[in-house]
């Protein structure tokens, strides 16, 4: 692979060439409102495998998990005090 013209995956040259690429679809090219929204929406396609949940559900589940761990921590501290 020494003489193949493409840079190795993960190298700085490969990263730089990925940054220089222009988007070929119409979703990523808009004006002020289309830049971030177009790149974010491409992750939420209908043919993507896995669960289809909104970012709000992920946020609520994360906060619930953090609260659950905090409650377990407090219960553990109180249990060992007795």
Swiss-Prot record:
N-acetylmethionine PTM positions: 1
Keyword Membrane annotated: yes
InterPro entries: Sec61-beta/Sbh, SecG/Sec61-beta/Sbh
Residue span of region Disordered: 1-34
Main location class: endoplasmic reticulum
GO cellular component: endoplasmic reticulum membrane; Sec61 translocon complex
Keyword field: Acetylation, Endoplasmic reticulum, Membrane, Protein transport, Translocation, Transmembrane, Transmembrane helix, Transport
Transmembrane domains' residue ranges: 56-76
Protein transport in keyword set: yes
Oligomeric form and interacting partners: Heterotrimeric complex composed of SEC61-alpha, SEC61-beta and SEC61-gamma.
Family: Belongs to the SEC61-beta family.
Known function: Necessary for protein translocation in the endoplasmic reticulum.
Protein name per its UniProtKB record: Protein transport protein Sec61 subunit beta
């Amino acid at each position: 692979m020494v003489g193949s013209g493409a840079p190795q995956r993960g190298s700085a040259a490969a990263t730089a060439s990925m940054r220089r690429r222009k988007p070929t679809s119409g979703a990523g090219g808009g004006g002020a409102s289309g830049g971030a929204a177009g790149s974010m929406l491409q992750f939420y396609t209908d043919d993507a495998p896995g669960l289809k949940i909104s970012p709000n559900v992920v946020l609520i589940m994360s906060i619930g998990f953090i609260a659950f761990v905090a409650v377990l921590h407090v219960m553990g501290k109180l249990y060992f005090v007795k």
